[in-house]
Amino acid sequence: MARDYDLKDYRNIGIMAHIDAGKTTTTERILYHTGKIHKIGETHDGVSQMDWMEQEKERGITITSAATTAYWKNKRINIIDTPGHVDFTVEVERSLRVLDGAVAVLDAQSGVEPQTETVWRQATNYKVPRIVYVNKMDKAGADFEAAVASVKSRLGGNAVAIQWPIGSESNFNGIIDLVTMTATTYNGESAEEEFPMEIPTDLLDVAKAKRQELLEAAANFDEEVMMMVLEGADVDIDTFKNTIRKATLTSEFFPVVCGTSFKNKGVKKMIDAVVDYLPSPLDIPPIKAYLNDQETDVVATDDGEFAALAFKVMTDPFVGSLTFFRVYRGVLEKGSYVYNSTKEQKERIGRILQMHANNRVEIDECRAGDIAAAVGLKFTTTGDTLVGEKSPKVVLEKMVFPEPVISQALEPESKAANEKLSLGLQKLSAEDPTFRTYTDEETGQTIISGMGELHLDIIVDRLKREFGVKVKVGAPQVSYRETITKSAEVEGKHIKQSGGKGQYGHVWLKFEPNHDQGFEFIDKIVGGKIPKEYIKPIQKGLEEKMAVGILAGYPMIDVKATLFDGSYHDVDSSELAYKIAASKALTKAKDLIGTVLLEPIMDVSVVVPSDHMGDVIGDLSRRRGLISDQEQRNDGAVIVRAKVPLSEMFGYSTELRSMTSGRGTYQMQFDHYEKCPKNISDEIIKKRNIQNKDEE
């Protein structure tokens, strides 16, 4: 079957923003104008097309990235709507991994906000070209120029206006296109229709000056056009557009457009900018992959061997497990087999679906550039590579996700619900790489871990709604870690030889701090002092002991262990004996290697009216917070940024509401681990040890 659209006519884009900047409404309007939906849904009414989970409809925020396909001016646009709440940063991360371009939505009054910085940084990591859409131009305090300036000052982004607003706040009623030097006005409150108009005389000089700024900024990326500008020659509109496109594709130049999505003003022009300036799959560099540990490139084409990346797994109430994937190369037909080169497993592709939020259309095949979903894959999880059954087993560059920082104990309200709870947790953890679940061996409790309180609230809610399991929830617990601060050489022995088959394991290990490098095991055994078959069990013994810690029962991180000596017994040595010997060595080393407790430190941004700033700063300081920055916003609010231990932030939203009469908001996300102050560390260790004794 031939392609409906050439690869050069594809646009795989994401809509990204701070919570409440209007990105779901913006996506709704794109779908409305491109003919995908016939009735507009409003987020505040709980009927948005893209927010299809019950929790999203109730809370008016986007939790999971819904995918949809739309068409505009002979281009196919695959859109992923991403969450703006930091607890769901993983959704943004995995979406950006498979997108070619993005629209960053800003609030015209607030400009760049805390979560904007986070998603912008993620997009920069993946080198995703962006256009900036300044939304809510009709809002009180809207300031287009200040919003553009905030991208430069706060994000370090080379943002340049390609449009200029006619009026602002309640007087916003038109847009000047700086490329074509034409103007458009709108009909009434909800602007279904656009009308051409002359550029208002009071804005003509401003528009000319801004057009020249735009031309000079874009010309920096095209020597030929730069020469034309320097010589004062005319640059025709097609050349001008091509120059802006070329600049945008470098990810170092960001065209800025404006509008108000809620009232339909500027949305069509924003879609035009997506089509004109964001990349097709052919415009981005080839994707990095590995074949037999050698780096190779995967070039976008239908003709090559099939290669795709699974970027999301979710449970659909009607079809079961859905795996979303982006095709980078080749063609996939329904009914065929693929090979999961990450898991080394064969999978059958029974059905292929194209998604529109939670509606689905069955398709026969998908090709390079497509984003689709497969039904019922058994082994594939987020970040896995899928290749043709008989293709070279390339593995695409992996996706990296942050570790969970907060935990809660769960208990089903009835024992009969245990099985349903287990099934629900298994499915939810398959969907979300930042959600973990395990059973505490000492207490028998089911523990869930995630990125924040809202993240875990949603999990508990989904257990109830989707799996019919009501649970009692314990108080949130901080995910502490243990690490070492000194080096030491330690002997570990596990020797039992008293008749019959004995046990003999004997090792010498050197432990060293391994800051930010995780666990590293080095084998320096020479001369066969320990046979090769026992080296892996020694490493395994250390890993198992590190998982439960040696100080207070928390996982250990950032340790280098070098095996440099030991001995063995011809008859009595075994894998188990060496595992135990290694574990004993680490336990014995506890005091010698300066084991300490680490606590998660959060990056906190609080937005408050300036008259409450002193109270907020004082309160954060009492919570052991270090104030890193304060910034005055145009609307009279202040952003206070601080690094605060997670343990001090429980219940902060209630406290902030009370302190600011409900006018303050905050965002927080994990930043790093830091050594606990001794008095707090001692208290935690004491409490954990008492707990453990009570349970013995």
Swiss-Prot record:
Belongs to the TRAFAC class translation factor GTPase superfamily. Classic translation factor GTPase family. EF-G/EF-2 subfamily. GO terms for biological process: ribosome disassembly. Keywords: Cytoplasm, Elongation factor, GTP-binding, Nucleotide-binding, Protein biosynthesis. The keyword Nucleotide-binding applies. GTP binds at residues 17-24, 81-85, 135-138. GO terms for cellular component: cytoplasm. It is found in: Cytoplasm. Disulfide bonds: none annotated. Residues 8-282 form the tr-type G domain. It holds the Pfam family GTP_EFTU. Gene3D superfamilies: 3.30.230.10, 3.30.70.240, Elongation Factor G (Translational Gtpase), domain 3, P-loop containing nucleotide triphosphate hydrolases, Translation factors. This is Elongation factor G. InterPro entries: EFG_II, EFG_III, EFG_III/V, EFG_IV, EFG_V, EFG_V-like, EFTu-like_2, G_TR_CS. It comes from Mycoplasmopsis synoviae (strain 53). Catalyzes the GTP-dependent ribosomal translocation step during translation elongation. During this step, the ribosome changes from the pre-translocational (PRE) to the post-translocational (POST) state as the newly formed A-site-bound peptidyl-tRNA and P-site-bound deacylated tRNA move to the P and E sites, respectively. Catalyzes the coordinated movement of the two tRNA molecules, the mRNA and conformational changes in the ribosome. The keyword Protein biosynthesis applies. HAMAP family: EF_G_EF_2_B (MF_00054_B). Its main location: cytoplasm. GO terms for molecular function: GTP binding; GTPase activity; translation elongation factor activity.
